[in-house]
């Protein structure tokens, strides 16, 4: 399912991110949607991947659990509640940005292209983009990528209900992870230009080095030398610590519920109650060195976690990282893109100057930016 000191950034050509769009009222009496076309592109089951990622995270010096644990069906429902909370400023700012500039950044998407959205958890923003493309009479194949089949099914069905008479934009789903999508594109071969839509500051859930690697991986596939893939990326660059803490550690404990769902999902993956929620507490904090908000599971007492033939010792007060959200300044975003072989072509920011978008394009590593 992402940032700059001045605010979010959106990139087109190699990366672009956008959050929620204005609420859209569904039509009352449209015909029932046809079954959704979802292509399973997983290389292997996510359960196997997550099992080994859990072990790897617990073996690390600074323990962590994979953030993908948070994004099951229950997690997506909880995150939807977070998006609708007044404290969660990224949605409000990205909505404003989209309303103002959607026509501008969709101009970079040409008729005949494929548009892949990396994460399809919140579709109000997506509807605005697809509606703009439809009104521009651009033939575009929209593919929503997500790890949850149920979320894909529901999201795409709703999209088709919002665009019941679409004749230019086609809609389908891709079931898999970011890595699955990159591998699928390489193996299937690109016959048309691909634009990636990466909204909601999702790119900044990764460490900068990992974000660079993911961007480079996605952008290796070309339909032809003259049709380099591009991305539209939204990045949050807010540096108001008080506002950030309110958004990621809400008074109603919704943030804690969202993060603790990861423990329940981990137990499901491991096949036993390794993590007992009552033995843990939640902590969210701002990391000024990395310009990043971090959420942790904190052990209330010493304990041993037995997984297979391995035993992991956790002391009282020890933190296991659950998820991060970077708030990257403009120069940081530019640096990440350049390291991935991407040139930032254009950017926009919201009225407060702290949420933005960038338009980018792949360039030869030997070229200058």
From Swiss-Prot:
Q: Where is the signal peptide?
A: none
Q: Name one GO molecular function term.
A: methyltransferase activity
Gene Ontology terms: biological process = methylation
**Domain of life, source organism:** Eukaryota
Family membership: Belongs to the methyltransferase superfamily.
Q: What does this protein do?
A: N-methyltransferase; part of the gene cluster that mediates the biosynthesis of imizoquins A to D, tripeptide-derived alkaloids that serve a protective role against oxidative stress that are essential for normal germination. ImqB is a canonical three-module NRPS that assembles the tripeptide backbone of the imizoquins via condensation of Trp, Tyr, and Leu-derived precursors. N-methylation by imqF and phenol oxidation by imqC, followed by cyclization via the FAD-dependent oxidase imqH carry out the three-step transformation of L-tyrosine into tetrahydroisoquinoline.
Under which name does UniProt file this protein?
Answer: N-methyltransferase imqF
Gene, per the UniProt record:
imqF
């Amino acid at each position: 399912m992402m940032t700059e000191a001045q605010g979010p950034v959106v990139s087109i050509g190699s990366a672009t991110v956008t959050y929620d769009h204005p609420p859209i009222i569904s039509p009352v009496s449209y015909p029932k949607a046809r079954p959704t076309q979802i292509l399973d592109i997983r290389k292997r089951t996510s359960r196997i991947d997550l099992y080994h990622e859990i072990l790897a995270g617990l073996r690390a010096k600074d323990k962590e659990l994979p953030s993908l644990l948070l994004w099951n069906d229950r997690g997506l429902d909880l995150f939807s509640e977070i998006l609708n909370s007044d404290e969660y400023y990224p949605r409000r700012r990205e909505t404003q940005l989209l309303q103002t500039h959607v026509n501008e950044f969709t101009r970079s998407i040409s008729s005949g292209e494929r548009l892949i959205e990396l994460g399809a958890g919140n579709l109000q923003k997506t509807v605005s983009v697809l509606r703009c493309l439809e009104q521009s009479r651009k033939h575009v194949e929209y593919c929503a990528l997500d790890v949850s089949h149920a979320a894909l099914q529901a999201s795409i069905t709703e999209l088709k209900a919002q665009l019941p008479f679409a004749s230019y934009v086609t809609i389908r789903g891709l079931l898999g992870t970011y890595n699955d999508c990159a591998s699928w594109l390489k193996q299937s071969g690109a016959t048309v230009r691909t634009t990636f839509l990466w909204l909601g500051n999702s790119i900044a859930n990764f460490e900068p080095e990992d974000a660079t690697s993911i961007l480079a991986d996605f952008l290796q596939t070309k339909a032809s030398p003259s049709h380099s893939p591009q991305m539209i990326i939204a990045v949050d660059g807010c540096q108001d610590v008080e506002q950030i803490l309110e958004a990621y550690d809400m008074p109603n404990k919704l943030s804690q519920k969202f993060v603790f769902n990861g423990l329940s999902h981990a137990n499901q993956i491991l096949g036993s109650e390794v993590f007992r929620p009552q033995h843990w507490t939640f902590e969210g904090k701002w990391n000024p060195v990395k310009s990043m908000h971090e959420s942790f599971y904190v052990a209330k007492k010493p304990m041993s976690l037995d997984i297979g033939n391995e035993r992991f010792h956790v002391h009282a007060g020890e933190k296991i990282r659950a998820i991060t959200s970077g708030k990257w300044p403009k120069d940081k975003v530019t640096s990440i893109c350049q390291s991935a072989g991407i040139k930032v072509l254009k950017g926009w920011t919201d009225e407060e100057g702290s949420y933005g978008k960038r338009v980018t394009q792949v360039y030869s590593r030997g070229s200058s930016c």
